[in-house]
From Swiss-Prot:
The gene is metG. Belongs to the class-I aminoacyl-tRNA synthetase family. MetG type 1 subfamily. Disulfide bonds: none annotated. One of its GO terms (molecular function) is metal ion binding. This is Methionine--tRNA ligase. Zn(2+) binds at C143, C146, C156, C159. Its cofactor is Zn(2+). GO terms for biological process: methionyl-tRNA aminoacylation. It is found in: Cytoplasm. A motif ('HIGH' region) lies at residues 11-21. InterPro entries: Anticodon_Met (IPR041872), Met-tRNA_ligase_1 (IPR023458), Met-tRNA_synth (IPR014758), Methionyl/Leucyl_tRNA_Synth (IPR015413), MetRS_core (IPR033911), MetRS_Zn (IPR029038), Rossmann-like_a/b/a_fold (IPR014729), tRNAsynth_Ia_anticodon-bd (IPR009080). It comes from Caulobacter sp. (strain K31). Keywords: Aminoacyl-tRNA synthetase, ATP-binding, Cytoplasm, Ligase, Metal-binding, Nucleotide-binding, Protein biosynthesis, Zinc. Monomer.
Length: 569
C-alpha cells in the first residue's frame, strides 16, 4: 500500500471561488484522491483557506466586517460549497490557525540561523492620503513588462511576471484610488533566494517527469535570475513577526507576507488534522526522519501559483536544512477562461461555485471541468460546449446505457440478475476491449493526466453501448432466453463497473448507480481482468433502475443562463 499526500493550492478567503479556481486545483486533486483511495492506498488530501494578506483586509472592509470575523465566516462558506461539490478533503484548514502561526515563525527563525534571512531598509510605497504604507496588493498600476493596466503590486495577472510594487507605472492606492503616493524607508525581512538558486535548480532538475508547463515556468524564473524576496509586510492582519518568544524589535506592527506563510499551511493544516483525531501523526507525512520518506507528495495548482511553489516555498523547505518532505510531482493547470476573457473574483465575472449548484447538480460541472481540463493550454468555457458535453457524454452515453439495461432487466427478468447461458465470442471480444481500456484509464489516472483520464473513461462507457447494440438482448429474448441472460448479466456487470470507475469524476451519480447493484461504497478500483470483473455480481441479485441520472440541458436553459451570467458579449 502506497502513501499518497495531496495538496491543492489554497483558495483565497475573499469570497466563494469561481469555476476556474475549481478546475485548476481543487477538483483535479479530488479526482486523484478518490482514485488513490479506491486503489487502497493510504491517501491524505489537504487544503485550507488562505486568510492573510491584502485580499482578506480589502474584502472584510468592503463587507463592513472585522477581518477575523470575515475570515471565519468565509471559511465556513468555502468549506460547505466545496463539500457540496463533492470535494473529499481529509482536512480543510485555515492559514490563520495557531499551528500555522507557530510553524511560520519557526521557519523564519531557522532560515535566519542558516544565514538566509536578512533585515533590510526597504523603500516601500506610502500613501499620503491613506496615511499608511501600501502592501503589494493595495497598489495597482501598469505592468512594466506587458502594459496591462490593472497589474497588482506583487504579480501581473496578464503576463504572470512577479513584480515589486515600485516597478508599476502610474500606480494608485486600491484603498482610496489616490495617486498621491511616495516611496519611504521601512524595515523588512528578506529571504535570500539568490543564495538558494543552485540548490533550487538542482532540485527541479531531479524531477524530469514534471510536466512541461510547471518546469518551463520554474526555469524561466531561474534563468532570469532569482531575486531576494521580502517576507514581511506593513499590515495588521497576519502572522506576527517574532524573535524567540517575543515580538521582533522594530517589527511589532508588521506581519509575514502571505506567500511566505500560505504554503507552510500545507504542513500546518496536516497538524490541524492530526490534532483533531486520535492516533493521527502529521510528522509521518511531512518529516522524512519520521516516516515520510515513503510518501509520494503531489501538488495541484494553477499556473499563476507555480513560481511561488517552485522557487519561494522550496527555498523555505530546502533552506531550513531540516528533513521536510518536498513535492514529488507538481501538477499545474492553465486557465479556464470565460468566453475568451478571464474568470474574475474581484469583478464577479463568470460562474461561481455556489451559483453553479443553484442551477445544476455537481456532477454536471465536475464532468465538464475534468473532461475539458486546461492542461496543455487555456480552455474557454461556453454554455454551448458545456451543454454538449453534459448531454452527449453523461445523458446519451452513460445514462442511456445504465437506464436501458436496468429497465430491460426489470421488464424481462423481474429485476433480478439472470442465470443461464455461457459467454460467447462477443463477450470474449468485450473482455479484451474492456481490459485494455481499463489499463489505459488506470495508467492515465496514475500519471495525473486528467483530460486523458476522462477521455479513457468515456471510451469505456461507449464500449457498453456498442456491446448492447450489437448483442441486442431485446431480439435474443424472443428466441433464446439463455443468450439474452448472458447479455443482460454481462451488461449489468458492466454498469456496476462503470459506477466504480466513474466515482472519482462524478461521485454522486456513480453512487446512485452503485446503489442499483447494492455495491459497497466507497468503491474499490477494479483490476484489469475484465472477465472476472464482468462476472462478479451474484446471480439472483435484485437490481433496480435509479431515477433519471442526467437530465438533458435544453436550449431554453442556455438562453436563461446566458442572460443571468453573461456569455458571448
Amino acid at each position: 500500500m502506497a502513501r499518497i499526500l495531496i495538496t491543492s493550492a489554497l483558495p483565497y478567503i475573499n469570497g466563494v471561488k469561481h469555476l476556474g479556481n475549481l478546475a485548476g486545483s481543487m477538483l483535479p486533486a479530488d479526482v486523484y484522491a478518490r482514485f488513490q483511495r479506491a486503489r487502497g492506498n493510504d491517501t491524505l488530501y489537504i487544503c485550507a483557506t488562505d486568510e492573510h494578506g491584502t485580499p482578506a483586509e480589502l474584502a472584510a472592509a468592503a463587507a463592513g466586517q472585522d477581518v477575523a470575523e470575515y475570515c471565519a465566516e468565509q471559511h465556513v462558506l468555502q468549506h460547505d460549497v466545496g463539500r457540496a461539490f463533492g470535494l473529499s478533503w481529509d482536512h480543510f484548514g485555515r492559514s490563520s490557525s495557531p499551528q500555522n502561526h507557530r510553524l511560520t515563525q519557526h521557519f523564519c527563525e531557522v532560515l535566519e540561523e542558516r544565514g538566509l534571512i536578512e533585515e533590510r531598509v526597504d523603500q516601500m510605497v506610502y500613501s499620503i492620503d491613506d496615511a499608511r504604507f501600501l502592501p503589494d496588493r493595495y497598489i495597482e498600476g501598469t505592468c512594466p513588462h506587458c502594459g496591462f493596466d490593472k497589474a497588482r503590486g506583487d504579480q501581473c495577472d496578464n503576463c504572470g511576471n512577479l513584480l515589486d510594487p515600485t516597478e508599476l507605472k502610474d500606480p494608485y492606492s486600491v484603498i482610496s484610488g489616490s495617486r498621491n503616493l511616495e516611496v519611504r524607508d521601512t524595515r523588512h525581512l528578506y529571504l535570500l533566494q539568490t543564495k538558494m538558486a543552485d540548490k533550487i535548480r538542482a532540485w527541479i532538475d531531479s524531477h524530469p517527469d514534471w510536466q512541461l508547463l510547471a518546469k518551463s515556468i520554474a526555469y524561466k524564473h531561474l534563468d532570469e535570475g532569482l531575486i531576494d524576496r521580502g517576507i514581511t509586510r506593513d499590515l495588521a492582519w497576519g502572522i506576527p513577526v517574532t524573535k524567540g518568544e517575543f515580538p521582533r524589535p522594530g517589527f511589532e506592527d508588521k506581519v509575514f507576507y502571505v506567500w511566505f506563510d500560505a504554503p507552510i499551511e500545507y504542513i500546518a493544516a496536516t497538524q490541524e488534522w492530526a490534532d483533531e483525531g486520535a492516533g493521527r501523526d502529521w510528522k509521518s507525512w511531512w518529516r522524512t526522519d519520521e516516516g515520510a520518506d515513503d510518501v509520494r507528495y503531489v501538488q495541484f495548482m494553477g499556473k499563476d501559483n507555480v513560481a511561488f511553489h517552485t522557487v519561494s516555498f522550496p527555498a523555505t523547505i530546502l533552506g531550513s536544512q531540516e528533513p521536510w518532505k518536498s513535492v514529488d510531482m507538481l501538477k499545474a493547470f492553465n486557465w479556464l477562461n470565460w468566453y475568451g476573457g478571464k474568470f474574475s473574483t474581484s469583478n464577479k465575472r463568470g460562474v461561481f461555485m455556489d451559483a453553479a449548484l443553484e442551477i445544476l447538480p455537481p456532477d454536471f460541472w465536475r464532468w465538464y471541468l475534468t473532461s475539458n481540463a486546461p492542461e496543455s493550454s487555456d480552455t474557454a468555457f461556453t454554455w454551448e460546449q458545456f451543454a454538449s458535453a453534459v448531454n452527449r457524454d453523461l445523458a446519451d452515453v452513460l445514462g442511456n446505457f445504465v437506464n436501458r439495461i436496468l429497465k430491460f432487466t426489470e421488464g424481462k427478468f423481474d429485476g433480478v440478475i439472470p442465470d443461464g447461458g455461457a459467454p460467447g465470442p462477443l463477450e470474449e471480444k468485450l473482455y479484451a476491449d474492456v481490459s485494455a481500456r481499463l489499463a489505459d484509464l488506470t495508467e492515465q489516472m496514475d500519471a495525473v493526466e486528467v483530460r486523458k483520464s476522462a477521455q479513457a473513461l468515456r471510451a469505456l462507457w461507449v464500449v457498453g453501448n456498442e456491446y448492447l447494440q450489437e448483442a441486442a438482448p431485446w431480439t435474443a429474448i424472443k428466441t433464446d432466453r439463455d443468450r439474452a441472460a448472458v447479455i443482460v448479466r454481462t451488461a449489468l456487470n458492466l454498469a456496476a463497473l462503470y459506477a466504480r470507475i466513474s466515482a472519482p469524476f462524478i461521485p454522486f451519480a456513480a453512487e446512485k448507480i452503485g446503489e442499483a447493484f447494492q455495491l459497497p461504497w466507497p468503491p474499490v478500483w477494479p483490476t484489469t481482468d475484465a472477465a472476472a470483473e464482468l462476472s462478479s455480481l451474484p446471480v439472483g441479485l435484485s437490481v433496480r433502475a435509479p431515477e433519471v441520472l442526467f437530465k438533458k440541458i435544453e436550449d431554453e436553459q442556455i438562453a436563461e443562463w446566458t442572460r443571468r451570467f453573461g456569455g458571448a458579449e
